[in-house]
Amino acid sequence: MAHALRSDLRNVAIVAHVDHGKTTLVDAMLRQTGSFGEHAHVDERAMDSNDLEREKGITILAKNTAITYKGKHAQGKEITINVIDTPGHADFGGEVERGLSMVDGVVLLVDASEGPLPQTRFVLRKALEAKLPVILLVNKTDRPDARIAEVEEEAHDLLLGLASDLVDDVPDLDVDALLDVPVVYASGRAGAASRNRPADGSLPDNDDLEPLFEAILEHVPAPEYDDEHPLQAWVTNLDSSPFLGRLALLRVFNGTLKKGQTVAWVRADGTHQNARITELLKTRALERYPAESAGPGDIVAIAGFENITIGETLSLIHI
């Protein structure tokens, strides 16, 4: 097996309880990287999606966000950080597991006052089961009722408890590695982050999100693939477009996927059929756009598969 890395790519899930500030944080990440216009915001773009679809005929609001990072920790490269939206509680168990299957690391975002809530426990357990590295992000450090050190300790206790529970169930689980968790302190509203713990109720001692980007690039591994392996892509979610019909959201694990390509579609019942990719869409900020091809680690949407469903795979046709 010839292992290779997509060093220009990171796939990460941000796990957070509702109202802990995930949308505001992702908004700030997009703005600071210039991933979309300076005056646009996540919620504004989301509300505009129907108008955008009508205007462009192909733009669909993505289920993931693609941040284009060219900052000082990119070492002269342009790095795409795909942020996958993962439901924050157990009611969406299957969707949580599928979302985590698309990523190589997790940012656990907790409110500096409320701390980790019970709903977070389920998602975090699934992430640890999958041996995904975790970054702890304590958000809203400037809340008047912030209790930063206590919340940090609560999050570490939660991680330790979950990891200890999993030791007997998950083979080769490296508990020490899982618990070696970097901590970032942030205010998504202020667009500020630091590795230094601020005083309760204070902003981080840094005026941008570079420490968060650095933590993601350092601790979330680049997608690994076998450059001699044929196409291998897995459908993890579905979407629809008034113009393209059913869309399959998938991650490419090996090989290359191309618009217009005819591939082997492996159905849930084990049968195979050949089908043609009529459209391939990548994500930029919050919008999907047409692309010609996708490689290992890429998360894309494809059209042309009318009855495709979650869990099915695409591979090369065997002649």
Each predicted region: which residue ranges?
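Structural and coupling elements of P-loop NTPases
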Residues: 1-317
